[in-house]
UniProtKB/Swiss-Prot annotation:
Pathway: Cofactor biosynthesis; pyridoxal 5'-phosphate biosynthesis. Catalyzes the formation of pyridoxal 5'-phosphate from ribose 5-phosphate (RBP), glyceraldehyde 3-phosphate (G3P) and ammonia. The ammonia is provided by the PdxT subunit. Can also use ribulose 5-phosphate and dihydroxyacetone phosphate as substrates, resulting from enzyme-catalyzed isomerization of RBP and G3P, respectively. Its EC number is 4.3.3.6. The active site is at K84. It is an enzyme of class 4 (lyase). PANTHER family: PYRIDOXAL 5'-PHOSPHATE SYNTHASE SUBUNIT SNZ1-RELATED. It catalyses: aldehydo-D-ribose 5-phosphate + D-glyceraldehyde 3-phosphate + L-glutamine = pyridoxal 5'-phosphate + L-glutamate + phosphate + 3 H2O + H(+). GO terms for molecular function: pyridoxal 5'-phosphate synthase (glutamine hydrolysing) activity. This is Pyridoxal 5'-phosphate synthase subunit PdxS. Belongs to the PdxS/SNZ family. Disulfide bonds: none annotated. GO terms for biological process: amino acid metabolic process; pyridoxal phosphate biosynthetic process; pyridoxine biosynthetic process.
């Protein structure tokens, strides 16, 4: 790959992710749910066999979804479709690319296939989404070719606190870099185990070079507005919609709250009459070995 081709491919992949800014990406497990999400205004859907709450509850090894399920969802909607591959499982990613998905999420929600290496995302034409809990992790995924970063949160809990923590961590570390001189940036790059050129770029621009969404525990319109006000560029919602009492209404309300995140009166209005939110789990009650956000390095 020539430098010109590399630059153009990177620009295209990141541009596709940029088109989703300000939107909501929803987990769906059937074509019918995908159509509900599209009708509610979702900017994209994530096709998978089990939402994170069910993966957490049922345990076992969580793998890439059945190709028939993914193709059924791709054929059901006109908005972009994402699908998950296990960390390090480049063959699952190859399969997903062959199925024509629009984005691949190398996801800690599934059981890792490789505890040393993430997928080399430069080997694919399809853009990748990856999770991160801090700036170093985000920059390592970008170095591997990720076109979008999502702060991980703790998927399948309905507890937004970890999403808030990870977003604050990433943004706080970016702000810290901005106050450093060049010598300090070299040290910071070593500390966070990220390439110096990327660290310097982040320090100069005050943001990641790719789109930053938030995931993990967003369950209400207020949750979505919270992370948007904190600087997220969009929201992933997993179990919070289709594990709630009125999925269609909640999906539409979260989309509206994500768009009107700085209008409390509008958020209050869309929060009315949504029925019961998902019951969820307090992250503090989840033992460390069972926390999905700990997967990845």
């Amino acid at each position: 790959m020539t430098q010109e081709t590399f630059t153009a491919t990177t620009r295209v992949k990141r541009g596709l992710a940029d088109m989703l800014k300000g939107g909501v990406i929803m987990d769906v497990v059937t074509p019918e749910q995908a159509r509900i999400a599209e009708d509610a205004g979702a900017s994209a859907v994530m096709a998978l066999e089990r939402v994170p709450a069910d993966i957490r509850a049922q345990g076992g090894v969580a793998r890439m979804s059945d190709p028939d399920l993914i193709e059924g969802i791709v054929n059901a909607v006109s908005i972009p479709v994402m699908a998950k591959a296990r960390i390090g499982h480049f063959v699952e990613a190859q399969i997903l690319e062959s199925l024509g998905v629009d984005f691949i999420d190398e996801s800690e929600v599934l059981s890792p296939a490789d505890y040393v290496n993430h997928i080399d995302k430069w080997n694919f034409d399809v853009p990748f989404v990856c999770g991160a809990t801090n700036l170093g992790e985000a920059l390592r995924r970008i170095t591997e070719g990720a076109a979008m970063i999502r702060s991980k949160g703790e998927a399948g809990t309905g507890d937004v606190s970890e999403a808030v923590k990870h977003l604050r961590t990433i943004r706080g570390e970016i702000n810290r870099l901005r106050s450093m001189d060049e010598d300090q940036l070299y040290v910071a790059a070593k500390e966070i185990q990220a390439p110096y050129d990327l660290v310097r770029e982040v320090a100069a621009t005050g943001k990641l070079p790719v789109t930053l969404f938030v995931a993990g525990g967003v369950a209400t319109p207020a949750d979505a507005a919270l992370v948007m006000q904190m600087g997220a560029e969009g929201v992933f919602v997993g179990s919070g919609i289709f594990k709630s009492g009125n999925p269609a209404a909640r999906a539409a309300a979260i989309v509206k709250a994500t768009t009107m995140y700085d209008d409390p009166a509008a958020i209050a209005e869309v929060s009315r009459g949504l029925g019961e939110a998902m019951v969820g789990i307090n992250v503090a009650d989840v033992p460390a070995p069972h926390r999905l956000a700990e997967r990845g390095w």
